A protein has these predicted regions:
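Catalytic nucleophile-elbow at a beta strand-turn-alpha helix junction centered on a G-D-S/GDSL motif
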Residues: 1-17, 68
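Short alpha-helical
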Residues: 13-14, 37, 124
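Alpha-helical cap/lid subdomain in secreted, periplasmic
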Residues: 22-28, 43-186
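Short glycine/serine/threonine-biased micro-segments
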Residues: 6, 34, 62
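Short beta->alpha junction loops
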Residues: 31-38
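Active-site neighborhood of phospho(di)ester-bond hydrolases with catalytic His/Asp-centered motifs
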Residues: 6-8, 31, 110
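Conserved donor-binding loops in enzymes that form glycosidic bonds
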Residues: 9, 34, 160
Length: 186
């Protein structure tokens, strides 16, 4: 049975069990029990998480909402774009290094929309993820495009997390992409 690891924030934690159900015929899906928060937290935590998880055949990861936040009202992102880009590159490299798999297939999931603002920041950070994916030979799972056309039906009252319909839509696309990669058709 193939092993898939999913890493990411609370959005990942919402859809991971459903992805596991959808791929149960070909893979075991696992991930850390904790929230990956921002990219720097995820990068630092790889050394703690990876030894406790199965050796992966494929990893999907995402970070973004925490990175672009301004929780301290400083008028800046928590992780500015240049630091975010550098950290996302490092996540890709460290995943391959720590697993001992220099050709480990990686999928980078884009940040989902929220019901706050105009999404300019989300689009900017997702563009960074696309650039990193191209430079690191990773596949992009565009979750933003799945949720964005139906924000009202897919995002909860908290304006961030997914509704059951959002979870299902994101899990369906994620499972399709991961299945295709495992079967060599993506």
């Amino acid at each position: 049975m193939k092993q898939i690891i999913l890493l990411g924030d609370s959005i990942r934690m919402q859809y991971q069990p459903v992805v596991g159900e959808k791929l149960a015929d070909i893979a075991e899906v696992s991930g850390p029990e904790e929230n990956g928060r921002w990219s720097g937290y995820t990068l630092n935590s790889l050394r703690f998480w990876l030894p406790t998880l199965p050796s992966p055949d494929l990893v999907q990861w995402n970070c973004g909402l925490w990175d672009m936040g301004d929780d301290y009202q400083e008028g800046r992102h928590f992780y500015p774009p240049d630091l975010y880009e550098e950290t996302c590159h490092r996540i890709c490299r460290i995943l391959r290094k720590v697993t001992g798999k220099p050709d480990l297939p990686l999928v980078i999931a884009t940040t989902t929309p929220t019901l706050h603002g105009d999404h300019e920041d989300i689009r900017q950070y997702n563009d960074i993820l696309r650039k990193v994916a191209a430079e690191e030979n990773a596949v992009v799972n565009d979750l933003y495009s799945v949720v964005s056309p139906a924000n009202a039906e897919m995002i909860c009252e908290d304006h961030i997390h997914l509704t059951p319909a959002g979870i299902e839509a994101v899990a369906e696309q994620t499972a399709r992409i991961l299945r295709g990669l495992l079967k060599g058709t993506a």
